[in-house]
Each structure stands twice: as C-alpha cells, then as structure tokens.
Amino acid sequence: MCNTKCYNTLAKMTVITEPAMEYMYSVPLDESEYDKCGFCQDPRYRPRRHKDQHLARAGSAKAKELCEALIGVYPRPTCESAVGHSIALVMPECMPGRVEAMGEFMESIFYMDNIAESGSQQDTGNLGTEWANDMETGPTTSVNSNTGAKQVMAKLALQLLSIDPVCAGNVMKAWKEWAAGFAKPRRFDSIEQYIDYRLVDSGAIVAVHLMNFGMGLDISVEELREVSDIVNHAGKALSYQNDFFSFNYEHDMFVKLPDSIGIANAVFVLAETEGLSLAEAKERVKELAKEHEDAVLRLKDEVESKVSYKLRICLEGLVDMVVGNLVWSASCDRYSSYRREKHQMELPIRIQGPPTPPQEPVYEKATLPNGKQLDAPTESSGKDLSDGVATLSGDEPVLGDEIVSAPIKYLESLPSKGFREAIIDGMNGWLNLPARSVSIIKDVVKHIHTASLLCDDIEDSSPLRRGQPSAHIIFGVSQTVNSTSYLWTLAIDRLSELSSPKSLRIFIDEVRKMQIGQSFDLHWTAALQCPSEEEYLSMIDMKTGGLFHLLIRLMIAESPRKVDMDFSGLVSMTGRYFQIRDDLSNLTSEEYENQKGYCEDLDEGKYSLPLIHALKHTKNKVQLESLLIQRKTQGGMTLEMKRLAIQIMKEAGSLEHTRKVVLELQDAVHRELAKLEEAFGQENYVIQLALERLRIKA
C-alpha cells in the first residue's frame, strides 16, 4: 500500500492507472478462525487482521486505566474478541504508528457507550451531541454531564490532533455533523424508516473518517460525499450486522429500562412491524444486510476508475471494515458472552403493538403563542361593549417573552467557539461541583457574555457578528438594548439559585470591573486617545478577563472541595491571550474577515495592541492619526484607508510584535495550566484541548 504522501500526491489524479491496493500491514485470516454466520458471502469479503495487534491492545489498556480513573469501573467487555481486537479486524491497514491511538480511542468509546446504555434512553440520546461538543470544545449545558467523560473525550481529541491535525480535523467535523443529525430513540413504522435512522445513529460516517485517519488518508467530509452512496450502503450493512449479534443484550436492557419505547434494533423492528418470529426476523436481517453488502461491491466497481486514488484506497478499506466488523461482532466478548448465557433461541419480546399514530391535541384552555394557558372566556369578557374600552378585569392576556428573547436567541444561534463553557467543564474536573451548579454557572456566564456582545455591537456600530448581520441590524437598536437589560435579569435570577452566599458579592465585584474596563475602551475610541500598552493590558484584565475571573470565583465558592490554589495567573494570562489573539486575527485572519468584515477594528476605531504599538513606533504617526480622525468623521474607513493603515503597521513591525506577544502569552497560559495540573495531581485535557483549538503556530 502506498504511504500517506503517496495518497495525497495521487489524490489530484482523475485517471486511475495504479494497481489495486497492496496490503502491507495485515494478513488474511484462516477460514477455520471465523464464522460469517450467513453474512458477507461474496468471496471478496475476506477478513484480515493487523500484524501489530499488540499495539491496539496496548491502547485499550491505556484507555481502560484512564476511564477507570476518571469515570469509574465498568466490567462489561469491550474491544476484544476470540478472533482479535476490533481495530486489528476493522482497520487492518491502519498505519502501525497509529494503531495504539486507534485502540485507545475505540476502547474509550466502547467504555462510555456502556455507561450510556445503562442509563435511560433520554440520557443516551443526549450523549452523542455532548461528546461532539467535548471534542470541539463547544458549549454544553446538560445537567447530566459526566466530568470524567469530558476529560476522556478531550484527551482523545488532543491525541488525534498531535498525530495528524488535518485528518483529526476531518474526524471532528464528521463527528459534529453526525451529532447535529442525531435523533432521539422512537418507535418505527417500517424497517426502511428504521434503517435510515440507524445509519445516522450508528455513527458509521465517523467510523469511516476514523479509518481514514488510521490509514493516513486526508479525505475531507466534502470529498467523502463523492462516494456517499457506497458509504451509506456500508453503514447499513454494518448496522444490520451489529443488530443481529447485539439483539439479546439490547433486549435485556430494553426490559430493564422503565422509559423504553422500543429497541433500536432491526430484529425488534421486523418482529414488531411485520409480525415475524425472532428466528424469522434474524433471517430477514441477513437478507437485508446482503443487499447492502452486494451494493457496496457493485458500486465500488463502477466508480473506481472515476475517483481519486485516495478515495479508491478508502473504498478498499471500507470493504475490509464491513467484513472485519462482522467477524468481530460474531466472536466478541461484548456480545458472544452474553449469547452464551441465553440458551434459548427465542426470547420473550416485549412488544407493545404497532406505533400509535399521533392524535390531534385536545385543548381545554386557550393556548398563547408563548405556551402559557388561559382559562376559556366566560360570558363576561371584561369589555364594555357600549364604548369599546377594555376594563381591568384580571382576564387580560399574559404577554410572553418571545419579543424580548428574539435578539438573544438569534445571537446564540450563531456559531461559537464555546471557549468559556469548555473552561468551566475543565475546571470542574478539579473542583467537582454538583451538576446543577455547573449548569447554573454556565447560564450566568452565557447570559452575561451574550449581553456584552449585543451591547458591544451597538456601541461599536458593528454590522456583522460571526459572519451574519448583528442583532441590532435586524431587530433595531432599541429592542436590542432592551434585550440586553433582560439578559442581566436572567443572569441574576439564575445566580440566586446558587448555594453559596458569596455568589452575589462575586457577581457584583466582577461585573463592576467589566463595566469599568469597557468604559475605558469606549472613551479611548471616542476621544481619539491612545492608551499605553500597560493601560491596555489593565483594561483587558478588567473587561475580557472579568468573565473568566467571575466563572472561576463562582466555581470555587460552589465547590465542595477546599481550594487554596491560586488561579489568578491562569485567568489573567487567558484573558490577555484571548483578547490580543483576537486583535491579531481581526487584522490578519481570512476567517475573521469572513465573520466580522475586513479589519473591522479599524472601522470601529478601536485601539487594539497592533494600533497602539504602531502609533508609538511608526515614522508615519501623523498619517495614521489622520486616518483615525477621518474614520470618526466618516463613520468608518474605506478599503484603501484600511490597506494604508495595515501597511503602516507592517512597516512599524506592529503585526509581528503582536504575534510575538500572542506566542508569549500562549506559552504563559500553558505554563500556568501546568502549575495547576501539578498542584491538583491531574492533567486537565479539556482545558488543554480548548487551548489547542486556539493555538497559533510559531
């Protein structure tokens, strides 16, 4: 098989002349070692096993140690089987240097899947989205969040990023898209309806990107869509195989869970919707799987000469994955040990009849748009019909919050890095707050942050926020200001639910600092008064760092642990890093330009670090000051004015100076984090990952 460089070089080719994939890292299994149980009967489905299976087992051992330390002991078997480790069978051509990482990844996922399956179906349905957020460091607010699981997911993501950032990015993007399409478990009317659901639920698309990671194939989410039909058929074949072998276990869990509405398993769905016996349903599953197994091979033959070489290698790997998953599922301890406990062929299936069609709701009260109910009107409506003037009868409609909430919901719907939420999750790995307290603090921080963004965009006359029109452009300044005030009431309301009597004092202290910091930022801009770098850092510590100080102090106050560690260094360095990195991105990042506009800070007249440095060191100070004066007169800068300002900054070395400061702060944040990790005796993978996603390369 070609190496990674070969894949990526040949990816641009449109005419395929290379021979079929040459296996380098695996050997075919002897037929005496496995039983296909009626699946994958085409001889091209020949299972293989990685030569370095011991590396996958070493990865599993690491994962088991980590998960037991951070999550707890869970005895159910995971990756092993009588034939081999799941990674060795499902990804037989994984690059040797990545086998151990893949083993650790898969073992961890199985471990957490065990926990999910032991909970309610509602909890299970939430975990896919939460894990995606944990890998992306996006916002999570679930009160059922498992702090240890978050640390594990962050550690896995960090490991993938350290090995191959590009392929890891493909995995994370696929995971995020998968989570966005995740649906809650439900009853199904037909096997067709079920398998479409199961294709998404199984996360097959993520598995394919993990396989590509293992093989060193840089295939983006968009590129893989070129062969989406084949991937979907493979995913459905994998799902039918898994359902066949996992049914007994899943049926047992179904009986035990009080909120179960059905089993997300093809055997159950066929038995329920088509009236088949268990044996008949299992045979039907084999037939359905065969249709998709055959389709994979047929479509693969049709497209091989039309796709890039790396996609061709991916399709070969997909065939190995389908048959490897089969052999593993048929022999793994995870399912086979359970089947040995069930000697009978037929299990009593708890079937509740066909799904009940939804009925029209019956209302006994009038329902307002906000969801609140009013008693049905009586003969006396509270209105004097003689003059048409309403009286105060007490029956007036209760107005809802849909208007005041509209700007808030709009802004919160836009993409966000979720950095502050990730910091809360990471800190909780050390502070061990109750889940309820974590949820409240996240809400308080979210409300304050959203309020500050709404207000900032108005004060800065910013037309864009995260690539979309700012809220005040859509809803108007007056309405957006009112929504900002409303958010402060929501924040205080949630704050009152915290148990610590210190919470209100902490809130007042830090919010006061934030407002003072903002006042200087606004004053410098309005008065065309350039601060010193030291004054600018003090403003950042109050304005940007204030929210970080707030969340840390609230968490310490709510923590059941006695905490005497000093977080001030980490918090201050993080606030400065976050803001000055933003200063640099505003003037140099194409992504930032797409989200906020070209050099938006210059339009707003903000004294960011590059501008402050330039005004002190440029030979063209009068020219730069004149540009700022004209900006104030005109309400912004033209493209040509911005280009001139950037040129002056470059000549003064201001952009390079700012980049140097960002890199120094980046190192400082990691040093402060390392101090706390040593003090607590525990690495904080969640915060490490959050910082890694912001990293600027030296």
UniProtKB/Swiss-Prot annotation:
Mg(2+) 4 binds at residues 456, 460. GO terms for molecular function: lyase activity; metal ion binding; prenyltransferase activity. Dimethylallyl diphosphate binds at residues 465, 543-544, 579, 586, 596, 606. Pfam families: polyprenyl_synt, Terpene_syn_C_2. It catalyses: 5 isopentenyl diphosphate + dimethylallyl diphosphate = all-trans-hexaprenyl diphosphate + 5 diphosphate; all-trans-hexaprenyl diphosphate = macrophomene + diphosphate. Its cofactor is Mg(2+). Mg(2+) 2 binds at residue 113. Residues 368-387 are annotated as: Disordered. Isopentenyl diphosphate binds at residues 417, 420, 449, 466. PANTHER family: GERANYLGERANYL PYROPHOSPHATE SYNTHASE (PTHR12001), THIJ_PFPI FAMILY PROTEIN (AFU_ORTHOLOGUE AFUA_3G01210)-RELATED (PTHR12001:SF72). This is Macrophomene synthase. It comes from Macrophomina phaseolina (strain MS6).
